[in-house]
Structure formats: structure tokens, C-alpha cells
């Protein structure tokens, strides 16, 4: 994750990664949202979950920290209130907003593979906002690498030793 460069440094490796902070607001009451949506103009994801609705968005590059910026949270709420009729984000839900850190590389591609310096180390990090989506494919590639099989795709663009 976002701490990968700190771990890599202990092994003499340099990974160009930084933490990209995303925010989420979980709405505990009923909402008019029935289907997941991405509000493209504001880049806010709206996801009905079991028992609540999640609003999520932003990509804040501010280092490894969990400081919640109220203006970011309110912007996410405003986006949903603008798109959905009779939609209001209750103040208590706003104050319970959380954030998470996503590992982001300069070119937006994850690092997948073995660095030249360590033949017994396989890296799979830097997936940014696509970690869960890319997890199964990355897992398959890591299994192929670990078992010594040829990988099912060319990993050159994802190589851990690439430089920017």
C-alpha cells in the first residue's frame, strides 16, 4: 500500500509512490439511491450498501496522514445533493466521514514483478483506486511469478525498476 516505499527503502529499493487520500461518507438512513453510480463531473461514487449508502471521492496528495479536511467532505456531500432530488446528507454523517490512502505511482500503473536486486521478492503495489478491481488479475500474475511460470501478459510496463 502507501507504505510500500518505506518498506522498499529498507531493502535498498526506490519506489516512486505516494499516498492518494480518498474520503467516504456512510449515510445510515434511507436514501433514494437504488443503483451504484459515478457522478462524473464531480468524480463522486455513490454506492448503496446493505443498510447504508456510501459516498466516496477525491484524490488528495498530502502525504501519509489521516487528517480529514472538512471542505473535501462537504464537496462530496454537495455533489450528491445536487444530483439526487430530495437528497440531504445529515450533519452527523458528515462528522463521521473517514479517509483511506491509496498507493499512487507517477504513471498510474502499479508495480508488479521482481526488482533486479532481489530475486526472492515479488512486488504488487501502487494500484491507486483500482486495487480491489485489479486484485484478482494481480494475484494471478504474482502466482505465476512465484511459481516460475511465464506470465500471462507482458509485465514490462509494471516493472518495479522502471524510472520516471
Show where each model-derived region lies.
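Active-site substrate-recognition segment that forms the wall
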Residues: 1-119
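C-terminal lid/capping helical subdomain adjacent to the catalytic/cofactor pocket in oxidative enzymes
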Residues: 114-164
Amino acid at each position: 500500500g502507501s507504505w510500500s516505499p518505506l518498506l522498499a527503502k529498507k531493502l535498498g529499493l526506490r519506489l516512486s509512490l505516494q499516498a492518494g487520500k480518498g474520503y467516504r461518507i456512510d449515510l445510515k438512513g434511507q436514501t433514494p439511491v437504488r443503483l451504484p453510480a459515478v457522478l462524473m463531473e464531480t468524480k463522486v461514487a455513490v454506492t448503496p450498501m446493505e443498510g447504508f449508502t456510501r459516498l466516496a471521492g477525491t484524490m488528495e496528495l498530502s502525504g501519509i496522514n489521516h487528517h480529514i479536511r472538512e471542505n473535501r467532505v462537504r464537496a462530496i456531500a454537495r455533489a450528491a445533493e445536487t444530483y439526487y432530488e430530495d437528497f440531504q446528507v445529515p450533519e452527523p454523517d458528515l462528522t463521521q466521514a473517514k479517509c483511506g490512502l491509496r498507493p499512487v505511482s507517477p504513471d498510474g500503473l502499479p508495480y508488479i514483478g521482481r526488482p533486479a536486486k532481489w530475486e526472492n521478492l515479488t512486488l504488487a503495489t501502487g494500484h491507486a483506486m483500482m486495487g480491489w478491481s485489479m486484485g484478482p488479475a494481480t494475484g494471478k500474475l504474482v502466482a505465476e511469478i512465484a511459481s516460475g511460470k511465464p506470465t500471462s501478459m507482458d509485465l514490462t510496463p509494471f516493472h518495479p525498476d522502471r524510472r520516471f
